[in-house]
Amino acid sequence: MAPGGAASRLLTFSMSVDLPSSDPAVAVSVVVPERNEAENIVPLIQEITVALDGRWDFEIIYVNDGSTDATAAQLAAVMKQRGNLRQLQHAVSTGQSAAVRSGVRAARGAIVATLDGDGQNNPAFLPDLIAAVEKGGKRVGLAAGQRVGRKDTGFKKFQSRAANAIRSAILRDGTRDTGCGLKAFRRDVFLIMPYFDGLHRFLPALMRREGYEIAYVDVIDRPRRSGVSNYGFFDRLWIGIMDLAGVWWLIRRKKSTPVVTEVTSDDD
């Protein structure tokens, strides 16, 4: 039995085994990392379905990051009605980056789209993000949402603007807003990224590090439907400083990969 007393399909895989490969029958995997957002599950899944139905063959992967509310039971109930809904569970909360990575590793679509589980990210913008990745072909690794008309408090907006300004100045990633959960990217490219806690905040810089272009899509934010944020000011501040230093180091230490040609005995 899953937490919450509901039967649920669980996916378990070791970090050391081969990953599931992309499935041609699934074009897009929508990954939703969430913790204690049970009340937001049904309306968000409905909105995702309205946005993508008839345009792509897609699956929705909810990553339940150690929720202590009715999340598991709510997802199990919806899964009985929607065959394209999957639930992954973390036994304990490990954070958003780990939740996103679990979802991407389990995804069957060649393109992965992400959005937060609190309802602030509007799924209506998912088609624009996915189309930007498709249009970009092998050049574009990531389509990133950039929020306009944010519905957060004045203090939270100030925090975000200051953090984005500092990050952009140091990393020179050309990105106005890395905190938006609305993103779409190629699964294969994401999986070559160096993994660390906080990865999701630095995807544009790390994609550029690997030589990929970024497409930007303006999105309109919404107020949180219910629940409370899982982040505090000092959590963001100190962890963000350490992560920023680490990403700066990774970029500085990047080496160009030489062209490698194998010479065989048949070559003249």
Language-model features: locations:
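A conserved acidic beta->alpha catalytic loop
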Residues: 64-73, 119
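Active-site beta-to-alpha loop of glycosyltransferases that engages the nucleotide-sugar donor
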Residues: 32-46, 66
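Cell-envelope/extracellular polymer assembly enzymes that use nucleotide-activated donors
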Residues: 27-29, 59
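Residue-level preference for short helical/loop micro-motifs built around acidic side chains
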Residues: 39-43, 69-73, 98, 177
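Short, acidic, metal-binding catalytic loop of nucleotide-sugar glycosyltransferases
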Residues: 47-57
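Short beta-strand/loop segment that forms part of the nucleotide-sugar
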Residues: 56-66, 88-89
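Acceptor/aglycone-binding surface of glycosyltransferases and processive sugar-polymer synthases
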Residues: 84-106, 111-114, 120-198, 223-249, ...
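Hydrophobic helical membrane-anchoring modules
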Residues: 2, 8-26, 165, 172-173, ...
